[in-house]
Amino acid sequence: MKILLYFDWTGTRKELKEHDKKMQKACIDTGVEHEGLFGSMNEKWNYVWLFQANGFDHFLEMSRKVPRPIHMTHYITELLIPIRL
């Protein structure tokens, strides 16, 4: 399952880079694939992380290892579920 985590960031680029490293470590620890941090063309959000997880519970296991920083003012999670035709 692909998981998109859209969020706004009020901190510096350095702080974002440090937080991304924490996310990458949590991914390694739990086996979730960190597929990158991207700038979002969606005018609502500043950034989006892309993850590959076995399921939403697997993703939650990873995300609970990294507390949400104060610079992440709000976020949404979008799940992309594979469809077999």
Regions found by a protein language model. Give the residues of each.
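Short S/T/G/P-rich N-terminal loop/turn motif that feeds into the first structured element of a domain
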Residues: M1-V48, Q52-R64, Y75-L85
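Catalytic alpha/beta core of large soluble enzyme barrels
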Residues: I70-T73
